[in-house]
Amino acid sequence: MRFALMVTGPAYGTQQASSALQFAQAVLAEGHELSSVFFYREGVYNANQFTSPASDEYDLVRGWQALNETQGVELHICVAAALRRGVADETEAKRLGLSGANLQHGFTLSGLGALAQAALTCDRMVQF
């Protein structure tokens, strides 16, 4: 079965993002396909490379990055939601005159078209 996820919760402060990552890992462990994860609204904070959890906490941002690197899962960040919340890649940072970029490697700024494409090509869309 082919899954796609939408994450609307931040990396820290709610259970949404950590539940989504655990679900993603379970889906892949069971032999299913996870085509992409789309981060929307507060979920874009999962791509902020400046997030620095305490040493005894799980690093969720790097957890998502590892999922991308080891499993090839596409990690899409809503560009409009990201820019409103101060998450930008090099291109957007330069365009907007920001002092630097903070988009974690492995994540891609995307429009809602990426979410629509995922919804059209998966068997199950799950929102967290």
From Swiss-Prot:
The keyword Transferase applies. Its EC number is 2.8.1.-. Heterohexamer, formed by a dimer of trimers. The hexameric TusBCD complex contains 2 copies each of TusB, TusC and TusD. The TusBCD complex interacts with TusE. InterPro entries: DsrEFH-like (IPR027396), Sulphur_relay_DsrE/F-like (IPR003787), Sulphur_relay_TusD/DsrE (IPR017463). One of its GO terms (biological process) is tRNA wobble position uridine thiolation. Its main location: cytoplasm. It is found in: Cytoplasm. GO terms for molecular function: sulfur carrier activity; sulfurtransferase activity. Part of a sulfur-relay system required for 2-thiolation of 5-methylaminomethyl-2-thiouridine (mnm(5)s(2)U) at tRNA wobble positions. Accepts sulfur from TusA and transfers it in turn to TusE. Pfam families: DsrE. The lineage of its organism: Bacteria, Pseudomonadati, Pseudomonadota, Gammaproteobacteria, Enterobacterales. It is an enzyme of class 2 (transferase). It comes from Enterobacter sp. (strain 638). The active site is at C78. This is Sulfurtransferase TusD. The gene is tusD. Keywords: Cytoplasm, Transferase, tRNA processing. GO terms for cellular component: sulfurtransferase complex. Belongs to the DsrE/TusD family.
